[in-house]
Amino acid sequence: MNLEVIAQLTVLALIVISGPLVIALSAARKGNL
């Protein structure tokens, strides 16, 4: 596999994983407040 393909896959994975995490963190912060 090319490094470009691996980089694109890692970026996609980070976006897919960080999406729900950011929502959960914001919800937790609002809930704590």
Swiss-Prot record:
Disulfide bonds: none annotated. It is found in: Plastid, Chloroplast thylakoid membrane. Coiled coil: none annotated. Keywords: Chloroplast, Membrane, Photosynthesis, Photosystem II, Plastid, Thylakoid, Transmembrane, Transmembrane helix. It comes from the Eukaryota. Its main location: plastid. GO terms for biological process: photosynthesis. The chain crosses the membrane at residues 5-25. PSII is composed of 1 copy each of membrane proteins PsbA, PsbB, PsbC, PsbD, PsbE, PsbF, PsbH, PsbI, PsbJ, PsbK, PsbL, PsbM, PsbT, PsbX, PsbY, PsbZ, Psb30/Ycf12, peripheral proteins of the oxygen-evolving complex and a large number of cofactors. It forms dimeric complexes. A core subunit of photosystem II (PSII), probably helps stabilize the reaction center. Belongs to the Psb30/Ycf12 family. This is Photosystem II reaction center protein Psb30.
